[in-house]
Amino acid sequence: MEIISKSKEERDIYLIPPNFISEGSLFGGMLKLRNAIEAVVFSLGIAVPVLKIAAFSFTTKIIILCLTALPIGIFALIGVGGESLTAFLINFFHFLRARRIVSAETTCVSDEKRTDKHLFPDIGDLPEEFDEEERVSVRKKRKKRQPAEADFFPVEKIENGICYLKDKRYIKIMQIEPINFLLRSAREQRNIIYSYMSYLQISPVKMQIKVISKKADIGSHLQKIQNDIAQEKNEKCKILLMDYYNLIRRIGLKEAVTRRFFMVLEYEPMPGGSKKNEEKEAIAQLHIAEQTARTYLRQCGNEVIEQEKPEEFMAELFYILLNRKKSNSVGFVENAAEAVDEYFLAVDKTDKIEIPISSLVMPKEIKFQKGSYIEIDGLYYACFMIPSDGYKSQVAAGWLSLLVNVGEGIDVDIFLNKEPKDKAQFRLGQQIRINRSKMKETSDTNTDFDEIDSAIRSGYYLKEGLANNQDFYYMNILITITADSVEELEWRSNEMKKLMVSQDLQMKPCYFRQEQAFLSTLPLNKMEKGLYALSKRNVLTSGVSGCYPYVSFEMSDDNGILLGVNRYNNSLIIVDIFNSKIYKNANMAILGTSGAGKTFTLQLMAMRLREKNVQVFILAPLKGHEFRRACHNIDGEFIQISPASHHCINIMEIRKTDQKANICLDGDQRAERSELAAKIQRLHIFFSLLIPDMSHEERQLLDEALIKTYALKGITHQNASLYQQDGSYKP
């Protein structure tokens, strides 16, 4: 294994080697060969005409060259954003040509013109049949013309649990439940990484992992609180529940953030397969891939969420990604109903039409007019990438949690592309030989000696990993930042850059490639070629597993109580300690310094558990008085046991044990025992604690006295004697 580990309890370190040099370069990779050629061409292209001008003196020509050819040559030699100058200029002019506003409005004749105006001024003099024919022709033209959004959105349809793309690909989108990876011990983390590595060995060739952070959807939790309010009979508890409802709603709208994790798998056609049955094969293969991912990720502790309506789930995901602001107030189903109504208004209802998926998920307009950001429905998007040389060579397990849990409005997309092993081994061997030959010709005093040596070490590391049955991957990471204004977008971008620099990482904006980057961030498992070349980083299976991404600090249970807001990622902490599927038991320990709020936390939990109709008992020997006010405010019972108190415990009281749970599990098979005998047995234990040196004769006399005492109240070994005629317990 290519893992640095000193002991079983220390965190493992995983290696992400630098890219071995796969293209022409000079000085051991310091300068790209293409940049050097362009610098020479541009410099000569300016210098030759200037030198041929006879009207200028030689000194004047030198000054002109220093002001023109020299800076352009240096600029071309360095490049722009990791690209050559010509590539940057080509991309810039392509952006100028392609910048536009993608709108949902069609270029067809509007409804007002179609319904209120005739096609000809003198249409009234023509027969009705002619008018109807013209109307039919207009409808046919309208059906042929598609809105700009239909051309922009790359999904053709969503059926059979998969997405059909316009480029004839088939993909499957799955949602994965994260785990709190960083709270696990080093041994547990190692086991999770090994399980994830096992899945990577059999995973598809291309994979996309998408992490979305957005405002938390607290609708289901609020609905449960409303149900509790309707069922609550105590008026004081109803008031508390209303306050709790308003608190959840206020925090959820302003502070609460949630994260969703998705995996996108792509159908891989078999070589030489038939195109006729490709759709059926794609459906079957993607279903098998989903089951495989579910099995292996369960070993890691993650669960693949089973979707009752996978088509609606995938359409809703696209709707959320393309309508972030609108989706907070208008759900997908409601928006789809409105879109269907609007679509039917534009066509004849008698025509048999198929509504495109773009009409259900696309926003009203997308503005691709700026080179550094995109505007969608009043929200601003900026896409960034981690360049090929922007990674740390040594990373800890789960290091991507830094990006995943950074805050609201930060999305992360990870692309994994598995290369053929034989092809990778051939290229590695070839490049190692080239670098070794360069090493022989280079003196150890040259500046490029260390670069070549690093490339050789990286090549040998990758070659050794491939020999140890690991796979060769190219990994790309895109980061999307969203904000409500340009100023906020710039502030978030600068803060994110500072965070990346503090962790020895780099982040570069996708200048004039925002449209391509935005399309790449959609869950379509396809990255634009230019961005792929600029951000790809070679890594082995062990390095990919070290980038385990399904990490979250959230604790948001369905039927829990609110404890607060996580200060690190602004997620709501809603805990249901009685959920045995998540927690091994319902025990808790509250630790903190004096004045940290231990008593307040305990009181808060008790109040909110009572609001959930959970009976709560608090034993507080020293600080019982601090719970008195809260107890009285919800009509609870405050019992003070002390020499001066009027409260006392009746140790002689008998209450029948509730056997409903045992009967539900085992049936009514157990013989009914005497509750009186069980109570007398417990009383013997109580008196033995008071009188430790009690003799056997005294125990027998005590037993007879207890039986006679209960008999005076009409209680015998028959359990029916515990009740009065109305069914209540005897006092």
What are these regions (language model features)?
Residues 1-19:
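Short, charged cytosolic
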Residues 23-51, 197, 558-643:
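Glycine-rich phosphate-binding loop of nucleotide-binding enzymes
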Residues 47-70, 74-77, 583:
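Hydrophobic alpha-helical transmembrane segments
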Residues 65-91, 95-549:
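Extended, folded cores of ATP/NTP-driven motor/assembly subunits in large transport
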Residues 89, 212-214, 604-711, 715:
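Switch/coupling segment of Walker-type NTPase motor domains
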Residues 451, 471, 487-488, 498-504, ...:
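Non-catalytic, charge-rich alpha-helical accessory subdomains
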Residues 502-586, 598-601, 605-610:
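Phosphate-binding P-loop/Walker A region and its immediate neighborhood
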